[in-house]
Amino acid sequence: MRLTRKRLCSFLIALYCLFSLYAAYHVFFGRRRQAPAGSPRGLRKGAAPARERRGREQSTLESEEWNPWEGDEKNEQQHRFKTSLQILDKSTKGKTDLSVQIWGKAAIGLYLWEHIFEGLLDPSDVTAQWREGKSIVGRTQYSFITGPAVIPGYFSVDVNNVVLILNGREKAKIFYATQWLLYAQNLVQIQKLQHLAVVLLGNEHCDNEWINPFLKRNGGFVELLFIIYDSPWINDVDVFQWPLGVATYRNFPVVEASWSMLHDERPYLCNFLGTIYENSSRQALMNILKKDGNDKLCWVSAREHWQPQETNESLKNYQDALLQSDLTLCPVGVNTECYRIYEACSYGSIPVVEDVMTAGNCGNTSVHHGAPLQLLKSMGAPFIFIKNWKELPAVLEKEKTIILQEKIERRKMLLQWYQHFKTELKMKFTNILESSFLMNNKS
């Protein structure tokens, strides 16, 4: 019995030793044989052989084992990387070379800010006494203020660079604009302002002599002048042309293009809603429309007296006419340039523009080959230009033959051009300010 127990114990001890030897063999020799299987992923091209770098082999093999938290670790790494990029982005966004405040004291200021700069205003209520907004373009940070409460001497001036937007169309407006310029002049003299530019709604006859003494080239302090209409002063050095834009004073909105605006069949060939002046080209236009019966194919609504403000109903009718017409007829008024041109562009309705120079001192065709509408023409406006309304019947006959798909492409082209036009103006305006104001700072 004792012998049997002794043999059993010896057998168990021998079995234990064999198992230990097997385990040791597996630990020291088995893992080495596994190395080639892991090498395609664990060892990169040009890595040292396993025999020479056992320590590296060990860590490489361990790194190739499946890690259940690998996905979470990668996500965390990506999150950290994203966060660092956001921090960097925020830090660079705040870095601007120039701060400019725009004082909007004419309705054209809203076209500049909301339509060209695509800026927002707080509050959004158009009747608010004080409205403001901010935007960054290029290296310039803009702030914009407007409203009846923006009065000379009644708000704090804590900027060095100002763009003043004024209305100089008639005597009463000129008097008001002059008060603002005298206020700005005083700020420059006491060194509260360093640089000043003016955006001016000029006179429709281009009679703007009143502002001449304020220009820097004439000994004044206004470094840059952006002026509406084809002024003969425009030289693209210190006087630049600026567009009239839409009638923001009549609450014409910022229009977002829609699928239906582009693709729907429009029921009217053309539209004209406006005031008819006696012995004017507008009267000639109406006669031509009626003569050929095209007034029945177009949305036409004429009135005898100009109205400075629209009712909600009349504004909606006008917008519907633009939206539902392929062409918008744009006869000259006191000046060739009119709000209707830009409003038609907003709705993808091709402007048919009476391309004739009106009376007054605006740029003449013998000196300025692009006049009238130099700015629009220089930027490739895809309009239909005619010299006489007698050409209109032929235009409308051609329009009747154009299929919907061609009209869709034409609308796309017009809307894309108009967006590009506004973007280019924003960048050009900013580049001019930066070049002038920053250069003068260095000198």
Curated annotation (Swiss-Prot):
It catalyses: 3-O-[Rib-ol-P-Rib-ol-P-3-beta-D-GalNAc-(1->3)-beta-D-GlcNAc-(1->4)-(O-6-P-alpha-D-Man)]-Thr-[protein] + UDP-alpha-D-xylose = 3-O-[beta-D-Xyl-(1->4)-Rib-ol-P-Rib-ol-P-3-beta-D-GalNAc-(1->3)-beta-D-GlcNAc-(1->4)-(O-6-P-alpha-D-Man)]-Thr-[protein] + UDP + H(+). It is found in: Golgi apparatus membrane. Changing G333R: In MDDGA10; uncertain significance; loss of binding activity of alpha-dystroglycan (DAG1) for the ligand laminin in fibroblasts from patients; loss of alpha-dystroglycan functional glycosylation in fibroblasts from patients; does not affect Golgi apparatus localization. GO terms for molecular function: ribitol beta-1,4-xylosyltransferase activity. Its EC number is 2.4.2.61. Residues 1-9 are cytoplasmic. GO terms for biological process: protein O-linked mannosylation. CDD domains: RXYLT1-like. Residues 50-59 have a biased composition (Basic and acidic residues). One of its GO terms (cellular component) is Golgi apparatus. Residues 31-443 are extracellular. Forms a complex composed of FKTN/fukutin, FKRP and RXYLT1/TMEM5. Belongs to the RXYLT1 family. Acts as a UDP-D-xylose:ribitol-5-phosphate beta1,4-xylosyltransferase, which catalyzes the transfer of UDP-D-xylose to ribitol 5-phosphate (Rbo5P) to form the Xylbeta1-4Rbo5P linkage on O-mannosyl glycan. Participates in the biosynthesis of the phosphorylated O-mannosyl trisaccharide (N-acetylgalactosamine-beta-3-N-acetylglucosamine-beta-4-(phosphate-6-)mannose), a carbohydrate structure present in alpha-dystroglycan (DAG1), which is required for binding laminin G-like domain-containing extracellular proteins with high affinity. This is Ribitol-5-phosphate xylosyltransferase 1. It comes from Homo sapiens.
